[in-house]
Curated annotation (Swiss-Prot):
SUPFAM superfamilies: dsRNA-binding domain-like, Ribosomal protein S5 domain 2-like. With S4 and S12 plays an important role in translational accuracy. Located at the back of the 30S subunit body where it stabilizes the conformation of the head with respect to the body. The lineage of its organism: Bacteria, Bacillati, Cyanobacteriota, Cyanophyceae, Synechococcales. Belongs to the universal ribosomal protein uS5 family. It comes from Prochlorococcus marinus subsp. pastoris (strain CCMP1986 / NIES-2087 / MED4). It comes from the Bacteria. GO terms for cellular component: small ribosomal subunit. Residues 50-113 form the S5 DRBM domain. The gene is rpsE. The N-terminal domain interacts with the head of the 30S subunit; the C-terminal domain interacts with the body and contacts protein S4. The interaction surface between S4 and S5 is involved in control of translational fidelity. Part of the 30S ribosomal subunit. Contacts proteins S4 and S8. This is Small ribosomal subunit protein uS5. GO terms for biological process: translation. Residues 1-23 have a biased composition (Polar residues).
Amino acid sequence: MTDTPTKQENQSKTENPPSSNANEQRRGNRNNDRKRNRRGDSKNERDSEWQERVVQIRRVSKTVKGGKKMSFRAIVVVGNEKGQVGVGVGKAGDVIGAVRKGVSDGKKHLVRVPLTPNNSIPTLSKGRDGAANVLIRPAAPGTGVIAGGSIRTVLELAGIKNVLAKRLGSKTPLNNARAAMVALSQLRTHKSASRERGISLEQLYS
């Protein structure tokens, strides 16, 4: 036989509401949840600014003691189309993991590109990586991106809309992409070039 609560016990329960400390703790938890949501939203906004394109996915093998270990290698170009671009390489046992590592590696090797008002580059530039040589030069508005392969991908994700590019030597996508990155990293605005050389803009153009 179970004991039923008396009227006095019921009255004491109703007369004693939850303490104010418990209410304050709930409010604090809600505030912390809101702060976490804001931080998550700002991170998602930053991530949404970046675009990634897979240039190449290859199946590679590594000889180990027990035989051959198969994996995937992904070449990924990352950029925000606002003057920042990077090339990354990722290896993993599956394609998704290789692409994810390539994106992370590309964001670690970003290059800032000076853009002109017509979304071109200020001067001619050359880049080399291994046996690949890349030449890029500015173009007039309306020209578009005259390039091919991985070089075109790098230039587009950098935010360049009018440019001429020429590939010399190796046709390897990774070497060409890295050569284009070298060429972009050597670009300087006219003001910075005159400042580095210690001359005025008039002397630079003359």
